[in-house]
């Protein structure tokens, strides 16, 4: 039974601690839109999405107003376009991306994800056409997001796909050089990608999903920080086990709020409710930062020794509390460490507390460790691919999701600033070791085999 104090604390989260529903994402199956004729594909896609999503934004706004809980982003995720458009050329794939952007504008959603391909074991014709289309597609559109899965624990790491993505990222950055490589901010490379991610840029509707489904992403880093601050102010001698328990209880409340909104949106749209993603997602705003939680836990800054252990504690406690609150937990459900999107982490990078090496290390205990990382524009495609390969290896060996969202900023070097705007924020450009050197290891290509599962050390 809820106590008066628990109800009041939840109201305080809404009033003073930046608690919101970060995203309501409507997944839409587009497989029956496939055709050899690109005009048929485009018309079917536009018709299907407008039919299912025309009321998404007004329903989210109405329910958010009803409960006093803002739904910050309304988004759409579609079936992997590499499969839907398997018969199309790369130039036709660009046209499909423009159609997705047009329909996103029509129904007034913030982003539409699913310009995606799954190439962990091999690259089919449609996959290659889509990957080749990505630089021009993301340059020509504002709301389309792309994700490519290049590795899995069962298949290994497709190094041909990894190198291809290194070149793709470099080309996308070049085409948006006047915007500090902005196209790359809408492109994520994955290992073990889940099929029900509500967050961008990784969202797509998996092959095993329904025709339409609502997936939720809750927020709450500011809520967690304030809860820790209050508890330590009352009792500075709390041990880490007690702090973990506190975070768990806070996560429970946040998740219940998210599921309440998600289920009501799904009921109003007459589609099934899918999952709540428990990921702590920051914004560039003060008081809505994952990085600030580390300082509340007693670290000088994210990136100093103790960071990985603190993140492990935080991530695990959030999952435990969320899993108790809902039987429908999914997506990434692991903390994001997006350098440019988190004001505190961006400042830590500027001061030199955190760099690529530490960000890669903490990926072992979270889902997206190399996220929105600006790197020097002269970093070679092979080096970009090598960074991705390192990130994929952590996910494959540890049987977990990992992802990389790297932005080589044209014309800028380590220590300069990159500006992306809005929720994407800004960041100091991180140095890369031997960034311009050739990398023969990456050029070998092929498949790094799937790891043995019985010997896990």
PLM ranges: what are they?
Residues 1-457:
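Anaerobic metallocofactor- and corrinoid-dependent redox/one-carbon enzyme cores
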């Amino acid at each position: 039974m809820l106590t008066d104090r628990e109800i009041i604390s939840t109201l305080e989260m809404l009033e003073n601690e930046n608690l919101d529903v970060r995203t309501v994402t409507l997944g839409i199956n587009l497989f029956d839109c496939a055709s050899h004729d690109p005009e048929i594909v485009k018309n079917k896609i536009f018709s299907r999405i407008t039919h299912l999503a025309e009321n998404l934004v007004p329903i989210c706004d109405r329910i958010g107003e009803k409960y006093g809980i803002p739904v910050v982003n309304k988004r759409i995720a579609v079936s992997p376009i590499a499969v839907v458009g398997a018969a199309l050329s790369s130039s036709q794939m660009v046209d499909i991306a423009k159609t997705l952007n047009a329909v996103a504008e029509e129904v007034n959603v913030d982003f539409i994800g699913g310009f995606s391909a799954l190439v962990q074991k091999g690259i089919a014709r449609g996959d290659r056409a889509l990957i080749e289309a990505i630089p021009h597609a993301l340059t020509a559109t504002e709301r389309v997001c792309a994700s490519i899965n290049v590795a899995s624990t069962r298949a290994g790491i497709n190094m041909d796909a990894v190198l291809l993505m290194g070149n793709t990222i470099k080309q996308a950055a070049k085409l948006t050089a006047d915007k500090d490589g902005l196209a790359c901010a809408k492109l994520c490379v994955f290992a073990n990608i889940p099929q029900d991610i509500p967050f961008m840029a990784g969202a797509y509707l998996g092959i095993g999903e329904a025709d339409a489904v609502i997936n939720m992403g809750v927020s709450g880093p500011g809520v967690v920080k304030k809860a820790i601050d209050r508890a330590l102010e009352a009792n500075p001698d709390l041990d880490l086990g007690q702090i973990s328990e506190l975070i768990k209880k806070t996560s429970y409340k946040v998740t219940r709020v998210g599921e309440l909104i998600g289920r009501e949106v799904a009921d109003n749209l007459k589609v099934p409710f899918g999952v709540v993603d428990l990921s702590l997602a920051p914004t560039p705003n003060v008081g809505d930062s994952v990085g600030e939680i580390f300082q509340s836990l007693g670290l000088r800054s994210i990136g100093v020794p103790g960071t990985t252990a603190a993140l492990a504690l935080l991530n695990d406690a959030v999952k435990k509390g969320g899993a108790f609150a809902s039987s429908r937990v999914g997506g990434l459900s692991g903390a994001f460490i997006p350098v440019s999107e988190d004001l505190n982490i961006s400042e830590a990078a500027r001061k030199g507390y955190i760099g690529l090496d530490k960000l890669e290390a903490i990926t072992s205990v979270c889902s997206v460790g190399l996220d929105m990382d600006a790197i020097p524009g002269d970093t070679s495609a092979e080096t970009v691919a090598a960074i991705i390969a390192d990130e994929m290896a952590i996910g494959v060996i540890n049987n977990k999701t990992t992802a990389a969202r790297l932005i080589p900023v044209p014309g800028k070097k380590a220590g300069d600033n990159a500006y992306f705007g809005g929720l994407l924020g800004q960041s100091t450009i991180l140095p890369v070791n031997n960034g311009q050197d050739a990398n023969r290891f990456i050029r070998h290509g092929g498949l790094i085999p799937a790891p043995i599962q019985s010997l896990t050390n």
